[in-house]
Amino acid sequence: MSYRKLGRTSAQRKAMLRDLTTDLIINERIETTEARAKELRSVVEKMITLGKRGDLHARRQAAAYIRNEVADAEKNQDALQKLFSDVAPRYEERQGGYTRIMKLGPRRGDGAPMAIIELV
């Protein structure tokens, strides 16, 4: 199985992908570099597929990966609850392809290619 190293150690890379996954579930749209967006896509697709399964084992697998952050203070909902109650039911009829990557221009500081990744 191939993956991008993203210039980090394996622990740093896993932590970054967990953070980005949680942020994407909460905000449903984030701006990051193209390489990170492409790597994030596969992780988020797997999380949404777990959400569609919806059983206890799937919920525990997702909880082991997603950070425990508040998604909506008004609904008193965290990221995991949002994944299983709001995000996953939207894609009940769709078999994969839950995200869209739109390329932006280069970043001002270092010229890194930027992209917006969002839930379809």
Curated annotation (Swiss-Prot):
Record flagged with keyword Ribonucleoprotein? yes
Protein known as: Large ribosomal subunit protein bL17
Q: Member of which family?
A: Belongs to the bacterial ribosomal protein bL17 family.
Q: Which GO terms describe its cellular component?
A: cytosolic large ribosomal subunit
Recorded hits in Pfam families, A to Z, give:
Ribosomal_L17 (PF01196)
Q: Does the keyword Ribonucleoprotein apply?
A: yes
One biological process term from GO is:
translation
What gene name is listed for this protein?
Answer: rplQ
Report the GO molecular function annotations. structural constituent of ribosome
Q: Which organism is it from?
A: Bacillus licheniformis (strain ATCC 14580 / DSM 13 / JCM 2505 / CCUG 7422 / NBRC 12200 / NCIMB 9375 / NCTC 10341 / NRRL NRS-1264 / Gibson 46)
Question: How does the record describe its quaternary structure?
Answer: Part of the 50S ribosomal subunit. Contacts protein L32.
**UniProt entry keywords in alphabetical sequence:** Ribonucleoprotein, Ribosomal protein
